[in-house]
Amino acid sequence: MTRLLMLLVRFYQRYLSPLKGGPTCRFTPSCSQYAYEALAKYGAIKGTWLAVRRVLRCHPFHPGGYDPVP
């Protein structure tokens, strides 16, 4: 399951994200890279939870910045 989720993130990074016309994430690493790293480090359940929390923080009213996977 983890590998499938990681493949979906890579698909998004490679084929869908470029359609947005440039970087739009407020964080470093980007939200999709954060999701990929969280899945690789923690597995499907905790990695998905961390990724969802991160995406919910990525909005115009949050300052963003450096936020690595714990």
From Swiss-Prot:
Domain of life: Bacteria
The UniProt record lists the keyword Zinc: no
GO annotations of cellular component type: plasma membrane
This protein's record includes keyword 4Fe-4S: no
Membrane topology annotation: Peripheral membrane protein
Cell location: Cell membrane
Record's keyword terms, sorted: Cell membrane, Membrane
Family: Belongs to the UPF0161 family.
Stored HAMAP family: UPF0161_YidD
Known role: Could be involved in insertion of integral membrane proteins into the membrane.
Name this protein carries in UniProt: Putative membrane protein insertion efficiency factor
